[in-house]
Regions:
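Polynucleotide-recognition surfaces of large bacterial nucleic-acid defense/processing enzymes
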Residues: 1-3, 79-85, 90-145
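N-terminal Rossmann-like NAD(P) cofactor-binding module of classical short-chain dehydrogenase/reductase
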Residues: 6
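Conserved Class I SAM-dependent methyltransferase catalytic core
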Residues: 11, 30-89, 104-105
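Mobile active-site "lid"/loop adjacent to the S-adenosyl-L-methionine
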Residues: 12-33
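Short, solvent-exposed loop/turn and secondary-structure capping segments
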Residues: 14-21, 65-69, 116
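Short acidic (Asp/Glu) and glycine-rich catalytic loops that position anionic groups and cofactors
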Residues: 19-22, 50-53, 83, 143-145
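Residues that form generic nucleotide/phosphate-binding pockets
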Residues: 24, 28, 74, 138
Length: 145
């Protein structure tokens, strides 16, 4: 087990999984079986020691889709969101256009219901540099909440 787990996991929806991987996902990670990146969220939380941190950048879909409701419940009821930057599309100039919408976050492997995390909504930025500038400005102005 690890004090810190950091990942930018691969994305693979159920349609891209072969039969063996799909069956394993349904059995091992029923709350996140819809995409490989979501299984990585759960696995990384399992790999972190109590009080350890999990830092990831993933697709944003787990925050909104009903298929990830149980995953969200696990995160909110068993862990703590320390910080989150909702990046949306165009977070990486090397990935052109609106190919993937992302979120970057740090979770603590401990439940602290009264903890107030730092949250940034950067979806309106149109480039990697613009999102970075928005983030630096928000933090400097104390708006990361």
């Amino acid at each position: 087990r690890y004090a810190v787990v950091v990942a930018n996991p691969p994305y693979m929806g159920g349609k891209g999984m072969n039969g063996r991987l799909s069956a394993w996902a349904k059995e091992t990670y029923p709350n996140s079986k819809s995409d490989l990146f979501a299984m990585f969220i759960e696995r990384n939380l399992d790999l972190a020691v109590k009080g350890g941190a999990v830092a990831m950048i993933t697709m944003q879909s787990w925050m909104f889709l009903s298929s990830y409701e149980a995953l969200r419940s696990r995160i909110l009821n068993q862990h703590t969101i320390l910080s989150m930057a909702h990046l949306g599309a165009r977070a990486f100039d090397s990935i052109g256009g609106e190919v993937v919408s992302t979120t970057a976050f740090v979770l603590e492997n401990d439940h602290k219901p009264d903890y107030r995390g730092a949250y940034l909504r950067l979806v309106d930025g149109n480039s990697e540099a613009e999102k970075m500038e928005m983030m630096v400005k928000a933090i400097a102005q104390g708006r990361a909440a």
